[in-house]
C-alpha cells in the first residue's frame, strides 16, 4: 500500500517537474518581451492567424500564457504565479487541477480559456451558481477584453436572444444546469431561430469549476424537461393519511427474529421501505381494495410506498424546506436551496401531501440527460476543485480525466487535529459548544460546519439559550460528586454546600478550592470537567454573537463568508462546497470596500472599480487616486477605504497570533472529499489555521455504516457522554465507514452510467438526425421524407406479399386497406395486377406508385412549402415518439431488477428491451411521418417563398444504427449502377440493410 501511495505521489511530482520545464520556464522567459508590447490584442490576433495556418495550441501555449499573464497584470493588477501557470497547463490538457482554497482558481482558468479560444469555437466556463458565473465573468472580463476576446454570461433569467449572444462570445460563463437545459431545449427546437447554442461545435471545450461537485455529487441527478401529465392529486393526500396509520417495524434478522415486525420496515442505507404481510393487509383494508400489488392496483401500491418513504426518509429542514407553500429541495452536498427541482416518480407529490401544501401535478419527461453523459459530449473538458484526488479513480474510469495536484504558492501550515468521538449526539453538541465558547473568548474566529439546516439551527439555539447547556453542567457535577464521595473535612463540606446550586456557580467560586484537588487522577479529571462546564455557562450567559448561513438564510451569504475570518467571529454554516468567497484572516477589505462603493452607486463589478479597490487595498495609493479621479470617487470614500484596510490589517495580525481561523466539523460526511472542503476553508495561502471534527455514534454515517462490533464493544465498556472516546478501533471505524459509503456510491453512479449509456446512445442518434432535419439542406430533408415513405410502404407491403406464399393466396384486400390508411392517393392503384409479379417486384411496384403520389403531392403544394411541411411533421412526430419512448424506458427500468430473481442479468435484459423499444419507436416514426405527409391538409394564405435554412454540417452520430429517418449518408450509399432506376437502387439498399441485420 505504501509503495502504491509513493508511486502516486512520485507520478504527480514528475508531472509537476514536466510542467515547470515545458510551461513555466518558457512563459517566464517571454515575460520581459511581452511587458513591452503596446497592443496585447494585436499580438493575440497574430497567434490566432498562426493557429489557422496549422500551428498547434501546444506550440502557441507559452506566448498565449505570457499574453494572458500580462493582460491580468495590466487590467486587474494581478500576476499569475508559477504554480498558476501549471494549473492553466493542466486545464489545457483536459485534466483536473486540484488547487487548494485561496490559490486563485478563477484566475488560473483565464490561461486555458485564452489559449483554447484561439480555435474560434468558443469556450464554456461552468460554475455551480448564477452568482459565481456573473462574478467571475465580470471579474475576469478585463483580462479577456485586453486580448480582444468577447465575454458572455448566462443567468437563469436570461432571454433566448441573450443566451444566443452569450454562446457566440469567445468565452461564456454559465452554470451547469443552465448549460444542460439549453442543450436539451435546443434539441426540442422546431426552427433554427430557436437554437441558442452555436450551430457548429456547440460543445467544444468546457472548464468545470467545482468539478467534483458537478461530475460526482450531481452525477445521479438527471436534468429533465417535462410537461404536465394527467394524474389525480387527491390520492396523494389519502396515501399520506394511510402512511400515518401504518407502524414502522424491525426487519427480519438471523438469530433474532424470523419475520419482520410492524406494517413496514425501512432500509435507510438504500432509502427504501418494504411493506410486511401485516402492512399489506392493513393497507388493503384502509383503501377498501383486494390485492394491493395486483396489476390494476400497482399505481396505488407505488403511491403508498412513496408516502411511507416521504414519512420516514425525507425530513423537513434536512432534505427540504417548506417556503411560501412550496416544498423546496435542499442540496445535500452544498446546503443550497434548489427551487424548481423536484423529486421524481411521485415522491415530491408525496412530500407535498405529507406537509399539507398544494400538490403540483406530476410531470411527463420530454427530454432528459445526466451530467455524466452531458459533459462527455464535449470534444474536450477540464476541471478545477480543491478536492479531487480521493475520487481520481472515478474521474479516470468514467470521464477519462487524470487529476494533478498543483502545488500551493506557499506551504500549508494548518493543523488538522484528531477527531473527537462521543457516544451520543447530545454529548457531541455539548463538546462543540464548549470548544466554540473557548475559541470565542480568546478571540479566535470559528467556522462551524453542519450537514443540515436542522443541525445548524439547533447549534445556534444552544449558543443563544444558556439553559440548554445546564444538563451538561449537572452531568459534570454528578461525575465530580461520585469521584469525591470519599473525601472528608470542613473544606470539602463547604465545597459540597456550594455545589448544591450549580446554576449559580461562577469561576471565582471554585478557585479557593483548587488546593483540595490532587494534580492527577480521576478526581482531577472530574474537577477540570466541572470547571470547564461552569466557565462555558458563564461565557454563554455573556452571549456569543454568531451568524447562521444555511439555505434559509442565504441572502447575505457572500458577506457572511467574507467576514468569517475576523476576530471574535463565530459562523455556523451548512456544507461549504461551492461557496466561492475567500475567507481572509482579519476580514476581507476588498469585499468591504466594494460594498461601500456599491452603496454610493458604483458598479462593484466594473473592471476599473475593481482595479481601484485592489490598488487601494494593496497600498498603491497614487495609482488608485488616478483611477478615483477618472471614476469620480470622492476623497472621503478613499479615507474610509484606507480605514477599512488598516482595521483589517490590524485584525489580521491579531488573528494570526491566535492561530488563524479554526474549523469545527460537527459530523463526518459520507465523503472524505466534503470533509476536506470544509477543512480547506482554513489555512489559505499559507495562513495559520486549525480544524477538528466532532463525531458521535448517533450520526447517520456511524449509525448506518459503522461496524456493529465496534458499537457493541462501546456498549460493553459502558462509555457515557462525560468524556470523548479515544481508541484506535474507533478512528479506524470512521475511516472504514467513509470508505464503505464512497465505494457504494461509486458503484451506484457506475451502474447509473451503465444504464444511462444505453439511453445516451439512442439520444445521440435521435438528436443528430433531428438536427439534420432542423439545419440540413432542403434536398437532405426531402431525402429523409422520401426514405420514410419508401420504408413504410415497403414494410407494410412485405407483411402481405410473402414470397413463400402463392400469389393467389395473398390478402390483397387487407393490403389495400392498410396502404390506403397511410396513403389514400393509392386508391386507384391496380392491386389485382400484383398477382402476376414476384413478391419483390410487387413491393417495388407499390413503392414506385407511392413515390409518384408523393411527387404529385409536392407539385400540389409547391416544393418550398413541402419542405417546410416535412420539417414540421418530422420534428413533431419525433418529439412525441421520443417523449413516449422516455416514459417506456422509465417504466422498464423501474421493474427490470425484479428479473434478477429469475437468474437473469438486469442490465443485459434492460439493454435488450431498450433496443427493442428503440427499434419499434423508429419504425413508428417512419410510419407516422409517411401517414401525416400523405394525409395532411394545408389550409393557408397565399404562400410566400420559404427561405432555405442555412446549411450547417452536422457531425455523424457515433452509435448504431447510423440511419434512422431514411437519410442515407453519402459514405454509406452503394455506388450508382448504370441502367438502374432510382427505385431499383433503393431496393438494393434495402436488401443490403436486411442482409446486415
Curated annotation (Swiss-Prot):
Q: Which GO terms describe its cellular component?
A: cell envelope Sec protein transport complex; cytosol; plasma membrane
List its EC numbers.
Answer: 7.4.2.8
Which GO terms label this protein's molecular function in UniProt?
ATP binding; protein-exporting ATPase activity
Which residue stretches does the UniProt record annotate as biased composition, category Basic and acidic residues? Answer: 957-971
Q: Where is this region: Disordered?
A: 950-997
Instruction: Give the matching Pfam families.
Output: P-loop_SecA (PF21090), SecA_DEAD (PF07517), SecA_PP_bind (PF01043), SecA_SW (PF07516)
Reading the lineage from the top rank, the first entry is Bacteria
The residues listed in the UniProt record as binding ATP, with positions renumbered to this chain, are 84, 102-106, 582
Name the PROSITE patterns for this protein: SECA, SECA_MOTOR_DEAD
Compositional bias, Basic residues, is annotated for 984-997
Q: Indicate how the chain sits in the lipid bilayer.
A: Peripheral membrane protein
Question: Which biological process terms from the Gene Ontology are attached to this UniProt entry?
Answer: intracellular protein transmembrane transport; protein import; protein targeting; protein transport by the Sec complex
Its function, per the record, reads: Part of the Sec protein translocase complex. Interacts with the SecYEG preprotein conducting channel. Has a central role in coupling the hydrolysis of ATP to the transfer of proteins into and across the cell membrane, serving as an ATP-driven molecular motor driving the stepwise translocation of polypeptide chains across the membrane.
Which PANTHER family would you find in this protein's record? CHLOROPLAST PROTEIN-TRANSPORTING ATPASE (PTHR30612:SF0), SECA INNER MEMBRANE COMPONENT OF SEC PROTEIN SECRETION SYSTEM (PTHR30612)
Record-stated family: Belongs to the SecA family.
Protein's name in the database = Protein translocase subunit SecA
Which organism's genome codes for this protein? Thermus thermophilus (strain ATCC BAA-163 / DSM 7039 / HB27)
